[in-house]
Swiss-Prot record, chain A:
Belongs to the acyl-CoA oxidase family. It comes from Yarrowia lipolytica (strain CLIB 122 / E 150). The gene is POX2. Coiled coil: none annotated. This is Acyl-coenzyme A oxidase 2. It is found in: Peroxisome. GO terms for cellular component: peroxisome. Oxidizes strain chain acyl-CoAs with a chain length of 10 to 14 carbons. Also active toward the 2S isomers of acyl-CoA-esters containing a 2-methyl group. Heteropentamer composed of five different subunits. The keyword Zinc does not apply. GO terms for biological process: fatty acid beta-oxidation using acyl-CoA oxidase. Its EC number is 1.3.3.6. Its cofactor is FAD. Pathway: Lipid metabolism; peroxisomal fatty acid beta-oxidation.
From Swiss-Prot, chain B:
Keywords: FAD, Fatty acid metabolism, Flavoprotein, Lipid metabolism, Oxidoreductase, Peroxisome. The active site is at E444. This is Acyl-coenzyme A oxidase 1. The keyword Transmembrane does not apply. It comes from Yarrowia lipolytica (strain CLIB 122 / E 150). The lineage of its organism: Eukaryota, Fungi, Dikarya, Ascomycota, Saccharomycotina. Signal peptide: none annotated. The gene is POX1. It catalyses: a 2,3-saturated acyl-CoA + O2 = a (2E)-enoyl-CoA + H2O2. Pathway: Lipid metabolism; peroxisomal fatty acid beta-oxidation.
Length: 700, 689
């Protein structure tokens, strides 16, 4: 009808408009994929077998009516708490008799679609159960299993660590467990309101028992914080045990499905045997035995960190898929007069906003897998350890230490990266990113607690930085250090390394660039550290002074790790058909990371100003290359529309149809008057203001 | 006196407050623009705080339905001020109330700024009078909304597809939605409230398309709120935030409106279908600037609220011990915690200076434009001057809007993280604050798009400068020679702390970036058209806008300090230096690359940032008290004035969630059957083979 109508788009001789074009555009985009998507999925999953298992589990979740997420974004807190409980009940059936690896897969996949259920079950199986298994003796573990802790019958556990006035600093906790030798009991007590257990997931509604962190006090002596099992509620009627007070923490930023609560203990008595005694033991006479190596007790904390790195990938891939699919069908502004508007994926700046993040999401997977495998090997070694194997023990302790610092940095930067991915992909979807039905808002609110719990990211980063400096100090003394920091051994080479005309698209050169950046930061911080120690500061004080340096060291070291792990996994596992597409992503990630932090490389003299221009050109180039395959790269994540749960990111690209339909399903347009029309709106629109009475008395 | 974790906080807060070395009221007055302004602000704040309808005590537990109704009640409570407030008072009221209740601010502003603003800005004076008579200003039997965005099209006005076809026979326009992709979408006020809208549609007369224009279209019958014939409206439902705003969608099916409902201040259509286009089209976009300017101010107001919470909490919260202490260390005393928050405090102050400057320029420019008649040839010169100024303001406000709304989102997020777990509690406001806030980065111009367009404007200005032509004051520095010559020996400490040097360092960085991008542009346009060349330079345009805007904030901050009273000057200077040096630290690549600073300088700057953090640290309570926010506006127990955080937080949680029943509401239906379940064994077939 109208030649200037920018909504008219012709494809293969047929006319489409803004509403009808998207699925056709999506099919065209999908056809551009030059690599076998299925092979890429196998690569990401770690082989065909894993992919098939994932698919089976995804299907089980998706087909279960209880896991229907059509209404998910419109549930209020009360509704979602109840639904979450129903889902927990269902999921617990799978936990009972399936291999541990499958359970992990199921949890991770549920976590993409419903973070609340994942956590609420995790409160029992990850935290309570993990603590009893990890810090209880074999007999104690057997006892709690017999009580129902294994299959959640007449039993639900929670994990009472944090207090109102104290977070993750175990040493500062104030709840006490005083041994009463006469009755052979511990008396658990909350000394004042700030020592109230706080944020305890599962406490407000569900839990019958808890593992409580309290100061072990025997004969007036404080032995520090240990873990105790305390029953919270009577099993038969869910009423509170004597001395227990519990309240609901109420509204949170996200994760409404979890019943976080607070707990106060007023002289609650528990049998001595409820102290978890794998490491610290108290006998009938009140003799306390402490473990030889405290580090070994931290193993269980690493599990959480490793799985958060992997979750960061899982959640990150969902949102990058939504934003990239939408970018391939959304048109906005016209670059050539008279032509249809341009697809937003074709704007160079839009590519720069999203494609490096796509590469980042891939990189997270490689590193999470690598650290996960290292962790499993170490745990096996630890389990196999003979009590008299001194050398073996030293090796395990050193491995655990290294894992502790590697996982700290990885947890921090991957959970932050995922938060950033959710936030940036939302903004990349413009207004529709703000709609509740496209999932960004809820996911961000649900996700970001990952940056705080199980170790605040900033604190973890600072502690990883501390460990890096300690490794450098050890190296200077000729002591052995772990693999993750072995590049520091080449200190002298790194100090003066330059690009010297080598290619910036050679993986070896890029890894070296990051080793130079990280190595020099760590070594410079170590110089400063040794100087401060020489000036008479103690180690804690010196590390405080070097806070900014520690943070930087951990940041750059972790980025180096991500980049090296990405290239190395491609090298060892990628088949020919997907090698180049993966290399394009890894190069984009490494180069973009340099661009984002160009100061580091200029400062160390590895790059010169003109090299930075080259880096920018290369980032543009790889964006252009990767752009052609974005549908392939994201299809390879293998998420069905159920897991995407965002109409603008659905597989077929028919974004406006699905989105319009979803909005109207959830908000049927029946009455143009709001529910409060008669009570509020009408009286307002039709109000008559009363005039102020004016006193009419004339003055005399 | 011995205290414990629970009783220690208010004692600590009093001690911290006692460290303040300046008269807090002086800084408050400096921020507000004088004692007289402070008094106005305080009067408005107490009128908000005392109104029971505006009480926000239970807001964090409202669901969507409750929030919608409550917001309507608040709109009603605030509506009398629409008539009595001056423009200045109205801005203050909206900004102050918006700090604690962003939904009400938006829902009211949909009518008051977007609808009324369009009628006033794009309608003729007679048209404006007509709609006033219908009740538009008094909001009686009238509520307006603003139907611009479409499902398939955002802020690109040219791409909109709704049509307004002139029917000469009936002297009417026919408003029509051609397909679902052209449904008006996100229209605040449409789902529940509005009787009328300003609709953006393509003007089509005698088959010719004259581009997008504004039309007033009645949506509902006034007496019973039923929909007008041909109007379909639905509810957009759940959003990330701002639940109190009833965003809706609207479809028009051949809806007829009188020709006079087209807003004709600029383009006109006569009863014979003759279309007159305005002499200067740009002026129609001037109205968009209002939104940007007020978002800069909002960024400051919302930031100051969350910074106050995080810094007060940091002064009473203890976590971990450093060697030798019996008590844990206050988190404000950790160098890294200072680095997380104090540069952001400085950033927040800088936003205020930038906001005031932008608002002043905007008011002057608008007054001038409204006084001019666009169709009077005698006023051509004045008009052209006004257009130049508007254009410049348009570009400057784009960058400021983008970076201050992003800055504020970052501040809310970082402050939340700095409060650890308690930042995640609904009752400390961060979650809702973030969810409500971030739409500011998208609406009225997506921040990225705004930055790119500003970058384009900067290159165009540089071309003007190179051609010897006049450019506005804020960009003239691009034509100056840099006063910095780095010989590789490094920069002395005094220089690195001197405002002149720091402003010049940023100007040099910005200038070099803009000029290098301009060179590349001139190279590219030899073979490409300007649009293509600018697309190639997207990354560079973004960087230009970013550095120029940071430069602008830093120089405005220093300029404003020059007007401050002597007793507060040193404290403000520390903040400004912290902001400038931290900005360099965040962007070392630029300064090394442009040879403005040496690697050694960067090390020195790292330690200067540390030093300034320590210097500002003792004044944080004074510097945040100076924002003048009562606990009502803070609305977060861990950020309360007296520092009694645990008592107030514990009380709040229990008020909102009385602990009466240890069994959840779904105990009988769900939990008990689960805990006491008996699984049925799978039957095993007993037949022997």
């Amino acid at each position: 009808m109208n030649p200037n109508n920018t909504g008219t788009i012709e494809i293969n001789g047929k006319e489409y408009n803004t509403f009808t074009e998207p699925p056709v555009a999506m099919a065209q985009e999908r056809a551009k994929t030059s690599f076998p998507v299925r092979e890429m999925t196998y690569f990401l999953d770690g082989g065909e077998k894993n992919t098939l298992k994932n698919e089976q589990i995804m299907e089980e979740i998706e087909r279960d009516p209880l896991f229907n997420n059509d209404n998910y974004y419109d549930l209020n807190k009360e509704q979602i708490r109840e639904l979450t409980m129903e889902r927990v009940a269902k999921l617990s059936l799978f936990v009972r008799d399936q291999p541990e690896d499958d359970i992990k897969k199921r949890f991770a996949l549920i976590g993409i679609a419903d973070m609340g259920t994942y956590t609420r079950l995790g409160v029992h199986y990850g935290l309570f159960f993990g603590a009893v298994r990890g810090t209880g003796t074999a007999e104690q573990f057997g006892h709690w299993i017999s009580k129902g802790a294994g299959d959640l019958r007449k039993f639900y556990g929670c994990f009472s660590m944090t207090e109102l006035g104290h977070g993750s600093n175990l040493a500062g906790l104030e709840t006490t467990a005083i041994y009463d030798e006469e009755t052979d009991e511990f008396i658990i007590n909350t000394p004042h309101i700030a020592a109230t257990k706080w944020w305890i997931g599962g406490a407000a509604h569900t839990a019958t028992h808890t593992v409580v962190f309290a100061r072990l006090i025997v004969k007036g002596k404080d032995y520090g914080v240990k873990t105790f099992v305390v029953q919270l509620r009577n099993i038969n009627d869910h009423s509170l045990k004597v001395g227990i007070s519990i309240g609901d923490i109420g509204k949170k930023m996200g994760r409404d499905g979890i019943d976080n609560g607070w707990i106060q203990f007023t002289n609650v008595r528990i049998p001595r045997q409820n102290l978890l005694m794998k490491y610290t033991k108290v006998d009938r006479e009140g003799n306390v035995t402490q473990p030889p190596l405290a580090q070994l007790t931290y193993g269980s904390l690493i599990t959480g960190r490793v799985s958060m790195a992997s979750d960061s990938h899982q959640v990150g891939k969902r949102f990058i898929t939504i934003a990239l699919r939408y970018a391939c069908i959304r048109r906005q502004f016209s670059t050539t007069p008279g032509q249809p508007e341009t697809k937003i994926i074709d704007y160079p700046y839009h590519q720069r906003r999203l494609l490096p993040l796509l590469a980042y999401v891939y990189a997270l997977k490689m590193t999470a897998d690598e650290v996960g495998a290292l962790f499993s090997r170490t745990m096996l070694k630890m389990d196999d350890l003979k009590p008299d194997d001194k050398a073996g023990l030293n090796e395990v302790v050193s491995d655990v230490k290294e894992l502790f610092s590697v996982s700290a940095g990885l947890k921090a930067f991957s959970t932050w990266a995922c938060a950033d991915v959710i936030d940036k992909t939302r903004q990349a979807c413009g207004g529709h990113g703000y709609s509740g039905y496209n999932g960004f808002g809820q996911a961000y609110a649900d996700w970001v607690v990952q940056c705080t719990w199980e170790g605040d990211n900033n604190i973890l980063t600072l502690s990883a930085g501390r460990a890096l400096i300690q490794s450098a100090v050890a190296l200077r003394k000729g002591e052995p250090v772990g693999n993750a920091v072995s590049y520091l051994k080449r200190y002298k080479d790194l100090a003066n390394a330059k690009l010297n005309g080598r290619s910036l698209t050679d993986p070896k050169v890029l890894v070296e660039a990051w080793e130079v950046a990280a190595g020099n930061i760590i070594n410079r911080a170590t110089d400063q550290y040794e100087k401060l120690i020489g000036e008479g500061l103690n180690a804690d004080q010196a590390f405080e002074v070097l806070s900014q340096q520690r943070f930087q060291a951990a940041k750059v070291h972790t980025r180096r790790h991500l980049i090296a792990a990405f290239f190395s996994r491609i090298d060892t596992e990628a088949g020919e058909a997907i090698k180049q597409p993966l290399l394009n992503l890894a190069l984009l990630f490494a180069l973009w990371s340099i661009e984002e932090d160009s100061g580091l490389f200029l400062r160390e003299g590895f790059l010169e100003p003109k090299d930075i221009d080259t880096v920018t050109e290369l980032v543009n180039k790889y964006c252009t290359t990767v752009r052609e395959e974005v549908i392939g790269y994201t299809d390879a994540f293998n998420l069905s529309d159920y897991f995407i749960n965002a109409p603008i990111g659905c597989y077929d690209g028919d974004a406006y149809r699905h989105y319009f339909q979803k909005v109207n399903e959830q908000n049927p347009a029946r009455d143009p008057r709001p529910p409060y029309y008669a009570s509020t709106l009408k009286p307002f629109l039709f109000r008559e203001e009363e005039d102020d009475d004016i006193c009419e008395l004339d003055e005399e | 006196m011995t205290t414990n974790t629970f009783t220690d906080p208010p004692v600590e807060m009093a001690k911290e407050r006692g460290k303040t070395q300046f008269t807090v009221r002086d800084v408050t007055n400096f921020l507000n623009g004088g004692e007289e302004e402070t008094q106005i602000v305080e009067k408005i704040m107490s009128s908000i705080e005392r109104d029971p309808v505006l009480s926000v005590t239970a807001d964090y537990d409202c669901n969507l339905q409750q929030a919608r109704k409550q917001t309507m009640e608040r709109v009603a409570a605030l509506s009398p001020y629409l008539v009595t407030d001056t423009e200045k008072l109205s801005l203050w009221r909206a900004q102050l109330h918006g700090m604690v209740d962003m939904s009400t601010r938006t829902r009211l502003s949909i009518h008051n700024n977007l609808f009324i603003g369009s009628i006033r800005g794009s309608g003729t004076p007679e048209q404006f009078k007509y709609w006033v008579k219908k009740g538009a200003v008094a909001v009686k039997q009238f509520y307006g909304c603003f139907a611009m965005t479409e499902l398939g099209h955002g802020s690109n006005l040219k791409g909109l597809e709704t049509t307004a076809t002139y029917d000469q026979d009936s002297d009417q326009f026919i408003i029509n939605t051609p397909h679902i992709g052209a449904t008006k979408w996100w229209i605040g006020g449409a789902a529940h409230t509005s009787t009328h809208c300003v609709c953006f549609a393509k003007l089509i007369v005698h088959g010719k398309d004259y581009g997008t224009r504004n039309f007033v279209v009645p949506l509902r019958n006034v007496h019973d709120h039923s929909l007008k014939v041909g109007v379909s409206i639905g509810d957009i439902g759940k959003k990330m935030g701002r639940d109190g705003v009833d965003n809706g969608w609207i479809q028009f099916t051949n809806v007829r409106i009188p020709r006079q409902n087209m807003l004709m201040r600029y383009a006109k259509v006569s009863d014979t279908g003759v279309v007159t286009k305005p002499a200067l089209d740009q002026l129609t976009y001037g109205a968009l600037i209002r939104g940007r300017v007020s978002m800069i101010a909002d960024s400051f107001h919302v930031s100051k609220r969350f910074l106050t919470i995080a810094l007060r909490y940091a002064c009473v919260r203890r976590q971990f011990g450093t060697s030798g202490d019996t008590k844990e260390t206050k988190i404000i005393d950790y160098p890294y915690h200072q680095r997380r928050l104090l540069p952001l405090l400085a950033y927040c102050y800088a936003m205020k200076m930038g906001a005031d400057e932008a608002q002043k320029t905007w008011i002057e420019t608008t007054d001038r434009i409204l006084a001019l008649n666009p169709n009077d040839p005698a006023q051509k010169n004045d008009l052209e001057k006004a257009v130049t100024d508007t254009k410049e303001l348009f570009a400057a406000s784009a960058g400021m809007k983008a970076f201050t709304t992003w800055g504020c989102a970052k501040i809310i997020d970082e402050c939340r993280q700095a409060c650890g777990g308690h930042g995640y509690s609904g009752y400390n406001g961060f979650g809702q604050g973030y969810a409500d806030w971030v739409v500011q980065c998208t609406w009225e111009g997506d921040n990225n798009v705004l930055c790119l367009s500003m970058g384009r404007g900067l290159v165009q200005s540089a071309l003007q400068i190179l051609a010897g032509k006049h450019v506005g004051a804020s960009i003239q520095y691009v034509g100056d020679k840099s006063k910095i010559s780095q010989n590789g020996q490094g920069t002395p400490r005094e220089q690195l702390l001197s405002p002149e040097f720091l402003v010049e360092a940023f100007r040099t960085a910005s200038r070099n970036n803009i000029l290098r991008t301009t060179d590349k542009y001139q190279e590219l346009v030899k073979t490409l058209n300007p649009d293509q060349a600018f697309e190639e330079l997207s990354q560079q345009r973004f960087q230009c806008a970013r550095i120029h805007t940071r430069q602008h904030l830093i120089s405005s901050f220093y300029a404003r300090i020059a007007t401050a009273k002597d007793d507060i000057k040193p404290h403000l200077l520390k903040l400004a230096n912290l902001f400038a040096l931290w900005s360099i630290e965040e962007d070392t690549g630029i300064f090394l690359r442009e040879n403005i600073l040496t690697p050694g300088d960067i090390d020195l700057i790292n330690s200067l940032v540390d030093e300034l953090c320590v210097a500002v640290r003792d004044q944080v309570i004074g510097l945040t008290d100076a924002f003048g926010l009562s606990d009502f506006f803070i609305n977060a127990p861990i950020g309360s004035y007296d520092g009694n955080v645990y008592e107030k937080y514990f009380a709040k949680v229990n008020q909102q969630n009385p602990a009466t029943n240890p069994r959840p509401p779904y105990y009988e239906s769900t939990l008990k059957p689960f805990l006491f379940r008996e699984e049925e064994d799978d039957e095993i077939c007993d037949l022997d083979e």
